[in-house]
């Protein structure tokens, strides 16, 4: 936030919209929402742009409205509103990316890992459609009330989808903001909720403070403000509203938006009187960046009596709002985000929110300016200046010398002399056990780490809700987590194989890392099967979602749902598979639902079921024309009809089917055969992704070999197709290919192709 936030000077700041009839204030807008999926309400009500200079879609940009049918995205309603705003020169807000209410109906039927994939896909499609956005309600209504009940019944499911509470209790929200910032770094990212000004004030403040303190890229807090005046619940007083606004701002020190203001009062005089109390207090607050009213047409709002126009005629409250917006107080009120633009992105990222007394805590100030240049950043702990930083990445260390809560403050000074501030907090615990690797030895990856060898330190710093002493005899608990300091020897793709045991289904875990610039999920959320007993361990393969960089990392093993046991984690480097060549089926880089089991003298994909899939990073070293490639799949099955589909995904996203492999009944899952076949698809050279989708389950897959012929030596046109035939180099007919050089003759689309094949 700019230090000179409350100054009245705004040289060069343009009015948001030349067409705005109510607000001419350059620091903040007075906006509204769509009416029954339309922008202009009709019915004698003035056109939208003649009243308001900001628009929010009431429903049109919510996930359920856009992707009601999975994979089909309907942006028509949102486009209509946003394009209207652009035509008339005012701003708009995307509402909302994450909400535990209006999500697609199909989402809840998916397992957690697939739900996260679906949510990531939702973010990606929103980014692809809207390259830039001025403002986003990233998360809507995630607070729990004073009774502990979530504001929306879908919140527990959404929380699980985004990785659970984790180290902070709000990691799922941090993850949502990181995902939004990754895609729209210049947007103003907002947390939005109701009852934040009356009944759930403290829980709301705690949530927003935690996001801010953890370094999440949250830029503002949004008060919906439905709780300020209602025939059902009464009216807030002027004194109470003043008090709670001050309480919020003192605690948060961030810009505030009033996001969904309405006064649901049937009596005209009482509605007007309540607007006269609340609107000036909200609008004139120097930390208020804008006010959005939640509907204005009687009969077309979510509650009965909040409309400001009834039968096309202004209610007295609307007449007063128009008069108030022309006063000097309304016109000259200052705000934190001139022109509704984010100049400074400043987030303080401590390595942890808790630290032992006497220990050293690394801290990064994530700082980026939109149009200005950073000269220096000063970081304070309380009133003590601990660092002045002039070059990115703006990382320093703090040695915790006394216990208690500490306030961090970053002051960013730009080359034009402007200053911007951001706060955070850390807790210094009274314990003096410093955080360090288990047995003071940092394991090098690739290697195996026993699950009980998590870092030494205090509870809440290096682990939570687990006991090293009872680790092998006590099932892991919901919300537990353990951190492991490791040293990755080389950049590259890795996988994690986890030995688990469980007497029930439903356990879940994932591996994450609290980096300075992101909360990274290194694995997808993995479900733990019922292995039969607490001592019967099964290996689960968890591909790492992104390549690891060489150097020191701190991995966090998050127990999303407990009730199971973990013995060890084995980290393996995955070599990039060169094709032609052999691909070991267990060496996948991504996948969903598959199991790795022992088989055929090693590891295999086992007990496959329909819908499972795996992907492999491959490098095609030899391009192939139509029919040049063939495959050999080492497989087993005890049933008829098992099959899997092979697809090659090129670097530009183009998908090419390589065909479907029908797995024969080999008599037993322990009896493996080699299934051969032709690939009638041209294959390009270069790095690509090979995907295997299980069409009909019941098979095991050990390996897949792709073979490219060394060259086509003759071709002649034929009128009828024949089966592939094998010949020796001297022309002798063979019943099957032999070791060494073979000639293969195959009729493809009426053309006989003879190829050299080396076995």
Question: Each predicted region: which residue ranges?
Answer:
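Boundary/entry segment of secreted carbohydrate-active catalytic domains
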Residues: 21-54, 58
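Acidic-and-aromatic substrate-binding clefts and catalytic sites of carbohydrate-active enzymes
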Residues: 32-45, 63-76, 103, 143-146, ...
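Short, acidic/polar
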Residues: 36-50, 118-126, 200-211, 275-279
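Substrate-binding cleft and catalytic face of glycoside hydrolase catalytic domains
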Residues: 50-68, 76-196, 265-267
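Aromatic-rich peripheral "rim/lid" segments of glycoside hydrolase catalytic domains that contact
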Residues: 67, 137, 142-166, 179, ...
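Glycoside hydrolase catalytic-domain groove-lining segments
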Residues: 76, 81-86, 166-189, 199-269, ...
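Extracytoplasmic
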Residues: 341-390, 397, 403-405, 409-709
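C-terminal outer-membrane/trafficking sorting elements
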Residues: 373-385, 409, 709-759
